[in-house]
Structures are given as structure tokens and as C-alpha cells.
Amino acid sequence: MPTINQLVRKPRKPRTFKSKVPALNFGYNSMSRKQTNNTAPQKRGVATRVGTMTPKKPNSALRKYARVRLSNQYEVTAYIPGIGHNLQEHSVVLIRGGRVKDLPGVRYHIIRGALDTAGVEGRMNGRSKYGAKRPKK
């Protein structure tokens, strides 16, 4: 515990906020080749690699992921939700924030049903989260 005199000499520093989705906090001006401070809820990018990885210890699966080169020159790893996907290299995707707890380093989700990503086929419940259209009667 510091004394009052110590606090007068060197006050307490406010805690700095560290973003959970750093790639969404910057834009990119391609004309001047500089970062801009424009934050965004989603970002567009191009898939550079699509594959599967295994989750952390208590879980077991092959989780689908894509390495995405964003429009602000960041390269991030994003999770592909839902059963089955049509993504391949050079697919244009839209990403949002949201980590996957059992995949280390995956802080983003790909939005299904946007740009080149198809929605989940045959999905009846929670369709809006997976870009699935309403089935015809």
C-alpha cells in the first residue's frame, strides 16, 4: 500500500483497455498505405487457407477454420460455424468478432450466408445465425 506522499509523486495509472478483436479496430487507407482508426462490426476478407484443427484437451473433434486476409491487411484465423461449408481458397468472406473457447488463437467467426459463404443446408432452427433461408411449405 503506497503512502499519500508516494501517490502525490507518482499517481496511479488508469487501466488500459485491451481489445478482444484487434483486427476489427483498424481500417486501412490503400491510397496512403496507412492504418486508420475506423472500427467496424464486421470486416471483409479473402480466405487464404481452409482446414480443420483439433480442440483443446477435454474436447475432441475436427473444427473447421479459415485463415483470412482482411481488407485492412490483417491476417486472422476465423471459425466456420455450422455443418458443412463451401469455402475454399480465394473465397470472399465476412467475419465478425467472437472467439471459440476450445481453439487457441481463433477470435473471429465467419458469417454464414454472406458474400461467398453459403448458409447451412437443411437447417430449421436458429436459421438467422447460419444464413439458412426459410424452407418452402
From Swiss-Prot:
Residue list for modification 3-methylthioaspartic acid: 102
InterPro entries cross-referenced by the UniProt entry: NA-bd_OB-fold, Ribosomal_uS12, Ribosomal_uS12_bac
Gene Ontology, cellular component aspect: small ribosomal subunit
GO molecular function: rRNA binding; structural constituent of ribosome; tRNA binding
Keyword Disulfide bond set for record: no
Pfam families tied to this protein: Ribosom_S12_S23
Domain of life: Bacteria
A GO biological-process term: translation
Disordered: annotated span: 31-57
Biased composition (Polar residues): 31-41
Assigned keywords, A-Z: Methylation, Ribonucleoprotein, Ribosomal protein, RNA-binding, rRNA-binding, tRNA-binding
Keyword NAD assigned: no
Role of this protein: With S4 and S5 plays an important role in translational accuracy.
UniProt subunit comment: Part of the 30S ribosomal subunit. Contacts proteins S8 and S17. May interact with IF1 in the 30S initiation complex.
HAMAP family: Ribosomal_uS12_B
Homology family: Belongs to the universal ribosomal protein uS12 family.
Protein name according to UniProt: Small ribosomal subunit protein uS12
Gene name of the record: rpsL
